[in-house]
UniProtKB/Swiss-Prot annotation:
Sequence intervals crossing the membrane: none
NCBIfam families: lepA, small_GTP
GO cellular component entries: plasma membrane
EC nos: 3.6.5.n1
Binding site for GTP: 17-22, 134-137
Top-level division of the source organism's lineage: Bacteria
Domain tr-type G residues, every copy: 5-187
Subcellular location, record wording: Cell inner membrane
Native organism: Pseudomonas putida (strain W619)
InterPro entries associated with the record: EF-4, EFG_III/V, EFG_V-like, EFTu-like_2, LepA_C_sf, LepA_CTD, LepA_IV, P-loop_NTPase
Membrane-related topology note: Peripheral membrane protein
Name of the protein in question: Elongation factor 4
Amino acid sequence: MSDLSHIRNFSIIAHIDHGKSTLADRFIQMCGGLSAREMEAQVLDSMDLERERGITIKAHSVTLHYKALDGKTYQLNFIDTPGHVDFTYEVSRSLAACEGALLVVDAGQGVEAQSVANCYTAIEQGLEVMPVLNKMDLPQADPDRVKDEIEKIIGIDATDAVACSAKSGMGVDEVLERLVHTIPAPVGEIDAPLQALIIDSWFDNYLGVVSLVRVRQGRVKKGDKILVKSTGKVHLVDSVGVFTPKHTQTADLKAGEVGFIIASIKDIHGAPVGDTLTLSSTPEVEMLAGFKKIQPQVYAGLFPVSSDDFEDFRDALQKLTLNDSSLQYMPESSDALGFGFRCGFLGMLHMEIIQERLEREYDLDLITTAPSVIYELELKTGETIVVDNPSKLPDVSSVTDFREPIVTATILVPQEHLGNVITLCIEKRGVQRDMQFLGSQVQVRYDMPMNEVVLDFFDRLKSTSRGYASLDYHFDRYQSANLVKLDVLINGDKVDALALIVHRDNAAYKGRALTEKMKELIPRQMFDVAIQAAIGGQIIARTTVKALRKNVLAKCYGGDVSRKKKLLEKQKAGKKRMKQVGNVEIPQEAFLAVLRLDS
């Protein structure tokens, strides 16, 4: 489609479970993207994990053709985005390729914190935001209250927001009709030199690197030689096309369009996300502003159960980082677990998803250590260092100041659950910044240690508010705190992979809770297993996993007591010898025991 005025690039912003993937299905159905036989629920959530958990993890793109009431046919390039707080970087990448966004809000639940955060990102990037009320067929739908919330909380006019039900299909045609008139057409010169932004890329074993691009200017077709600006390498284009949502090859991609380019790039990092593509004949084309590199918030060690899998594990991580640019990793070795990688994630859900993807897609068996955040330490020498692994902490005597990361958490919660949420925030060492009453909801802002937020705060917030509270958070600053390193000893030996950094006030409680939890998780051996928690040289908690014991006296009927004593002494000596040479198998659950201390 050569006329730019008939192209619309948009994405959907919505909180988890507000129905954006279902709305996407309706769009595809109405525009004839798939036949009735090929249609299935949540067509765009193609990863097994996405279907099982009912969430969108990766951004997906679809090109549809919609015949509007004015008789014109519009090309809609639609990019589906995730709604979970851990995947906000996927959202910002999708928004960079669009001119507008649909803000989909559940007409029963109202505005949630994550939609607010993503909506502000869209407005900052200069996008036209169009509100849509979904789930209007539900008995608890209250459109007037929700319109009021959109205006009060986000600050955009929602008086004429389109009402629809993605599930039943009611009002979806009206959404499409409003969309082509509200969202502006892209700008760009088709005859100018090629300038395309890479929004996403993934590795295909047969095709090499497949890049999803938004063409800003010019055009690209099969047989062109393209130049990747950051690497300076030239590649020959094998094919270009769009997703309808099937892989559909086209003659070319022009300014304003979103589609894929395959150029037999075999090097995994040959076309990084956020890079600019141009033709090799016009290397002077300027680079487009990419995306801000996202910094991991949570670090954890990942180790293969069998050391033979180490090379496969490294290859799998390389392929995954291409598809998920926020994942960072570096080699690490542990006395207890051997060789593995220290990986940086955006949050706990991100960590779980990555581990599951590695285990499923690459057939690996992995052990994960307890997650940790980044701490800042000031040493007596005057230098400042950052530590993301508790086992790498320097000796306490050389540290003058220990600083932990503080996040600003914004929580939206109905008034009746406010008390429970405030209690939870105080328990997590939160300091209240402000509170605003917005209709039936309350917006509270807290400064909280990131360590407390990333571990289990999200789950506990949901359970304490019966699922109604929603959370968004961002890093604010480092702040001095009274922190200590909690070591775990098994039979007198420190296990580096189990070390934690905790607040001194909570250390004794955490130590006791952790040793008790470990006692439940470590299987009984033929000898006693002592589990201790220590700060420095001081043991603050201890439990013992009792030995399994064979009854050696079973064959003695009556007889002399010295005979029984002899058998017991012999058993005791054997156990003692076994304890010296025996090693304790620690299951995966024990490494993550820290996450389940409160449950």
